[in-house]
Curated annotation (Swiss-Prot):
Family per record: Belongs to the SNF7 family.
Assembly description: Probable core component of the endosomal sorting required for transport complex III (ESCRT-III). ESCRT-III components are thought to multimerize to form a flat lattice on the perimeter membrane of the endosome.
Subcellular location: Endosome membrane
Recorded topology in the membrane: Peripheral membrane protein
GO biological process assignments: endosome transport via multivesicular body sorting pathway; late endosome to vacuole transport; protein transport
Keywords associated with the record: Coiled coil, Endosome, Membrane, Protein transport, Transport
Keyword Magnesium assigned: no
Official protein name in the record: Charged multivesicular body protein 2a homolog 2
The encoding gene: chmp2a2
Disulfides per UniProt: none
Length: 198
């Protein structure tokens, strides 16, 4: 297929498929609108036949109406399926863009590593790790201290009672944040306990 021409990139293939899908969806919409207009006309014809007493003709038209509505529904389903495929293509395009961005970052990192003074970089990283370890130790000690204070000062029932008060005051929004920010909630509970104790 590409013996005498340039092979298309994955990005170009995705874009072409996206264009074809959009074109197909527009054609489906046109057909569906035409069928809906036909549906309205059939309904008017059925009413007209019924008023004239032509019940056999009205029944035939009613069957046409059923078929027309069936096709309209099918066009809706087809468009929904194409939209799902379109969304998948957009996701693939995003993934492709992400991969290209990662390639760029990797190249930049390689260049940076070549240009950087390795001993100096190693020293900086070691200092960073040491300071990070110190911070982790301090945070762990603070958490242990807070846990001990809470165990000595407040029991399970009191903690639950305080938490319920906080939830009642702030509302449902805090409940949704419990999973995302447990540390914040713990601080709020501890603050509330101190206020109540004082």
């Amino acid at each position: 297929m590409f013996l005498f021409g340039k092979q298309k990139t994955p990005k170009e293939v995705l874009r072409e498929n996206q264009r074809n899908l959009n074109k197909s969806m527009r054609e489906i919409d046109r057909e569906r609108v035409a069928l809906q207009n036909q549906e309205k006309k059939i309904i008017l014809d059925i009413k007209k036949m019924a008023k004239q007493g032509q019940m056999n003709s009205a029944k035939i038209m009613a069957k046409d109406l059923v078929r027309t509505r069936y096709h309209i529904q099918k066009f809706y389903e087809m468009k929904t399926q194409l939209q799902a495929v379109s969304l998948r293509i957009q996701t693939l395009q995003s993934t492709q863009a992400m991969a290209e961005a990662m390639k760029g970052v990797t190249k930049a990192m390689i260049t940076m590593n070549r240009q950087m003074n390795l001993p100096q970089f190693t020293k900086i990283m070691m200092e960073f790790e040491q300071q990070s370890d110190k911070m982790d130790m301090k945070e762990e000690m603070m958490n242990d201290t807070m846990d001990q204070v809470m165990e000595q000062d407040g029991e399970e029932e009191q903690s639950q009672e305080i938490l319920n008060q906080v939830l009642d005051e702030i509302g449902i929004d805090l409940a949704s944040q419990l999973v995302d920010a447990p540390t914040t909630v713990g601080t709020s509970v501890a603050s509330k306990h101190q206020v109540n104790s004082g």
